[in-house]
């Protein structure tokens, strides 16, 4: 999706994300700092960005997870709450300081959900196709991986506009 700013006086809409590649999923205008917070699909990630409606500049929020599932903004304080996950953990809830740019882990559901599960490592693995396009992918190693043994391989690569999440 795209994000537009509608001017009530002129009755004109201007695209804020015309030259922005990630797909807009959701947007919230924050009363506290006047910024627009956008949840986006960005390749095989789901990230949060800020958009300054005065100049259209978009910046990524430095979240601690690869997939942001949901977020909420405080009305009267510089705080963004979000929860998300990465390849090796389940949902975690964070408080993000909008002024200082720091994440604080509030609750780790991953500890309970994954306490009896051994996880291997996940590594990015990108390659160039014959036409020069970079194909983004990753591979998963089993728990207690031994490089001297042979294993079946699971390969995932990003190849479309609406990805399978990490």
Where are the language model's segments positioned?
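Short, solvent-exposed loop/turn segments at conserved positions within beta-propeller repeat blades
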Residues: 1, 41-46, 86-89
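Multi-bladed beta-propeller domains
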Residues: 1-32, 40-41, 51-69, 98-121
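Glycine-centered loop/turn positions within well-structured domains
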Residues: 11-14, 34, 46, 91, ...
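Conserved protein kinase catalytic core
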Residues: 13, 46, 58, 162-165
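Residue position within the beta-strands of beta-propeller blades
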Residues: 35-39, 80-83
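Serine-hydrolase catalytic core recognition
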Residues: 70-166
């Amino acid at each position: 999706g795209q994000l537009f700013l509608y001017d009530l006086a002129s009755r004109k809409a201007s695209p804020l994300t015309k030259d922005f590649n990630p797909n807009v999923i959701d947007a919230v205008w924050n009363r506290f700092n006047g910024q627009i917070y956008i949840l986006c699909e960005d390749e095989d990630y789901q990230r949060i960005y800020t958009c300054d409606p005065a100049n259209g500049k978009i910046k990524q929020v430095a979240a601690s997870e690869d997939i942001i599932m949901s977020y909420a903004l405080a009305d009267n304080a510089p705080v963004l709450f979000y929860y998300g996950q990465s390849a090796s953990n389940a949902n975690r809830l964070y408080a993000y300081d909008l002024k200082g740019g720091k994440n604080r882990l509030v609750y780790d559901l991953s500890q309970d959900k994954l306490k009896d599960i051994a996880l291997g490592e996940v590594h990015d693995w990108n390659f160039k196709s014959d036409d020069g396009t970079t194909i983004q992918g990753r591979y998963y190693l089993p728990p207690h991986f031994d490089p001297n043994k042979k294993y079946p391989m699971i390969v995932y690569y990003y190849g479309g506009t609406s990805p399978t999440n990490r």
